[in-house]
Amino acid sequence: FTDPWISAKDEFLVKKLEYLSIKNGFSIDSTSYPMPLALLRNPNEDMFNNITLMADYIAVADKIVEKESKKFINEIGFSSNSEFNPFRFIDSKFKDKNSFFFSNSYLGERFASKISMTIYESPFEERKYDFSDSYLALVSGNFILGIGNYDRWWGPSHHASLILSNYSKSSPGLFIRSLEGFTSPLPLINYFGKLNFSFFANQLESNRGIKNPYLLGGRLSMNPVNGFTIGLTRSIMFGGKGKDNSLKALWDSISGDASTMKGEQDGNIDNELAGFDLKYSFNLNNVVWSFYGQYIGEDGTDYWPWRTFYSLGTEFIYLEQGKLRSLVIEYIDTYYNGVDTGTNITYEHSSYTSGYRYKGTPLGAFIDGDSNYAHISFHG
């Protein structure tokens, strides 16, 4: 693995760091993937509370970083299934019924690149190859900037992120994110702890209701209290063939005015989702216990998301005979039960008729809209 970050596919590696961090009284933000390797090594200023546990944490982090930090690597892999698997979780490694991939990666001091080609069989697409998980990235100061596409997972759930997950193919575009987070001596900002952010501007496919719209996304997460993570997330589907692609319309979308007034050329210029997620973890008799939830809504008319849906979960992480174990219980509900109750609301849109999807599959939860899902899983 030659990436400047660790992807959601290797989430279980991060669980041991999460276990050691909570036991030592500090936090690691495990609610957003990919996670920069620099953030693994320096997750929180309070990591020095217990020298013994800190040494254990650093040893595990260094082992992960050493594994991920090879300068050059080639990878080949394949998967084969009798049928297309509609289930996909945070650590799922393949997306298609049958697939074969090859990738070539480079990781330098300030520069990283990856070219990956996948040949696949999928019921949702006519084209049988793509270049998902290919990018060029540059580290500048405390930022990672780049161009390309890769999977993102925004939210604390292990089975379905409501706003951005690995279920659809990754779309191409530009991105910028924090390398190891930001802190400030200013009292107001310092109160929120370490801040991590991620932003991208992608373009979606032509084979949809509105051809080639743009997808903008941003996430800010913070740790105001050790063990407690707050994430704020927003995505905007904007423009495309036949829509208003002007800078004014873009500003109206970003500022929130697009949902409260009509533009000059287009009365419904974007499709937005926004919301927040919370995760709190604590140590109880050498078991790290977490509670978490995500709350997302469709376009709002008063600068607040409405037509909302949610997920809830809890996780137990512990060591048994020196091996890490994880028990997860989650519930996800993408029905909307408020005003204008009915079906075809979540992930749907009157103008962007292909909905909140890319190449036919949801950008958010794999269960799509009008669904609920409960799951119990054990890893170890």
Residues of each region from the PLM?
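Short, solvent-exposed alpha-helical surface patches in non-cytosolic proteins
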Residues: T2-D3, K15-K23, S30-V65
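Well-ordered mid-protein domain cores that form the structural environment of catalytic cofactors
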Residues: F94-Y191
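Transmembrane beta-strand segments that form the barrel wall of outer-membrane beta-barrel proteins
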Residues: F72-D91, A112-P123, L145-W153, S157-L162, ...
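Residue-level signal for inorganic ion chemistry
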Residues: L40, G141, G293
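Soluble non-cytosolic domains of exported or imported proteins
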Residues: S7-E11, S30-M35, K95, K211
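Short linear interaction motifs
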Residues: Y19-G25, N85, Y358-G360
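Transmembrane beta-strand segments of Gram-negative outer membrane beta-barrel proteins
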Residues: S7-Y19, A55-M117, L145, K194-F199
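Signature for the C-terminal beta-barrel architecture of outer-membrane proteins
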Residues: W153, G173-Y356, I367-F378
